[in-house]
Amino acid sequence: MKKFFLASSILSADFARLGEDTKKAIDAGSDWIHFDVMDNHYVPNLTMGPMILKALRNYNITVPIDVHLMVKPVDNLIPQFAEAGADFITFHPESTDHIDRTLNLIKECGCKAGLALNPATSLNFLDYVMEKLDLILLMSVNPGFGNQSFLPTSFNKLREVRKKIELNSSNILLEVDGGVKLENISEVAFSGANVFVIGSGIFGYTDYNVIIKKIRKKLKNVYSTSIH
């Protein structure tokens, strides 16, 4: 397994050429695709449904797709996204009455399960479900829109979650989403994240190869420092 994973957030891609733009990001070195689903109810925006995910799979997008459900209620959409081709499905604790049951549903559908925490959401939600998690997603902005600035309070929260993961001797992936870019990715990585959701920090550039190469160089330096 790689030390770090880049998940290109297609919320920032060119929707008129979504398949092509997604493929360009992958060819430039993106490991995953991050797929944001918003319902204009749980969050104040409306984005993509299962048919868009299925269309990407039909376009020969084969890398892991990380579906982030910002919807309420959430359970009825999980089988649809699993069938459409999701690898990871992540939801927010506020979107369900039974976190444990929703995690079980994701697993039953054949996907890896994640829990997403907003900037002001307590980490206590993790305490009784760690053994069922494959991924923890920390939001470093308030969800709903792309191209926001990284909230500095997220650094401490990342460090706290990393401690929880290590105390459980777990292989849970720690993902961060919101305002991650070339200028701050080193500090984000040093704080404990190993999956980085990047939207405008990749799609906002003309040449994805150049920016991803620069990001990889920063992460390589973090890795080299951390093993010495």
UniProtKB/Swiss-Prot annotation:
What is the organism field in this record? Buchnera aphidicola subsp. Schizaphis graminum (strain Sg)
Question: What keyword terms does UniProt attach to this protein?
Answer: Carbohydrate metabolism, Isomerase, Metal-binding
A molecular function annotated in GO for this UniProt entry is: metal ion binding
Pfam families registered for this protein in UniProt:
Ribul_P_3_epim (PF00834)
A single GO BP term for this record reads: pentose catabolic process
UniProt cofactor note = Binds 1 divalent metal cation per subunit.
Q: What is its EC number?
A: 5.1.3.1
**What does the record give as the active site?**
D36 (proton acceptor), D177 (proton donor)
- The residues the record assigns to binding substrate are S9, H68, D177, G178, G179, G199, S200
The residues that the entry says bind a divalent metal cation are H34, D36, H68, D177
Q: PANTHER family per the record?
A: RIBULOSE-5-PHOSPHATE-3-EPIMERASE
The protein's name: Ribulose-phosphate 3-epimerase
Keyword field contains Isomerase: yes
